[in-house]
Amino acid sequence: HVIQICDLDGAFAPDDSVRENPSAEETLYSTTDIVTTNRDALIADRTTKRNGVGSLLKLDGFRKKQGGRTVLIPYRLFYVSRNLEHAFRGRTDNLDAQHKQSGAIKLADRFTRDPNLFSTTLQSLRRIHGNPATWEESWRYAMQDFHSLERGSNLAFVEPYLAGELQ
């Protein structure tokens, strides 16, 4: 199995929620809007991300020749919203690379020591992001309204996917 995890970064929020502020020091996200120094560039980036996600969601896997037959290596795309720090730590500020890395290491250490906490956290992130019953529902929810700006994730579906319970 191949799994890929992406940040949503508000990609599916309506374009009119992107506001331009030339004096903004960095792109700022909230649950209802995105403020940036270059609105057109950010909208173009979001369009690229939406199109990329749309293409990846259509993939069921990768085909590989093995001997005389073709083998399917299953593939599935998962998300965190808005990003890892927002989903898992509730951080809404923009972090530099060093703080992102140290935060990820602390999370990994915490979850390694308490795997049940990891599972509980994934289920909580699923519930607060529309409480979808299926992987497909999770993506439909994430693509509606402002949900790609809200905290949440569909990573709770990784384990059932790897166990062969999701098709």
Where are these regions (language model features)?
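C-terminal accessory helical subdomains adjacent to catalytic cores in phosphodiester-
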Residues: 3-167
